[in-house]
A protein has these predicted regions:
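Compact, glycine-rich, soluble single-domain proteins
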Residues: 1-79
Length: 79
């Protein structure tokens, strides 16, 4: 049985998950899609910056930094 989706920002360093939903405004979604962050994409949370913002994730073989407010709107299914 798979776990319920949680926000990307609630993961801890080293956690792996799969993107299940992106609840950002339509104007912000194309930028993430261009960087390869799509529903169904596996990700790994690498680290939070010292003050908690930004959040660094590994997606499709490269590291990507997101603002914490963006990470809070991305729902993932933990692996």
């Amino acid at each position: 049985m798979s776990e319920s989706p949680v926000s990307l920002s609630s993961l801890t360093a080293g956690d792996k998950a799969t993107v299940s939903q992106i609840d950002l405004p339509p104007a912000d979604r194309p930028r993430l899609m261009e960087m390869g962050l799509l529903v169904g994409t596996p990700i790994e949370l690498i680290r939070f910056a010292p003050m908690g913002d930004p959040v660094e994730i590994k997606v499709r073989g490269y590291n990507l930094s997101l603002r914490r407010h963006e990470a809070e709107k991305i729902l993932v299914a933990p692996s």
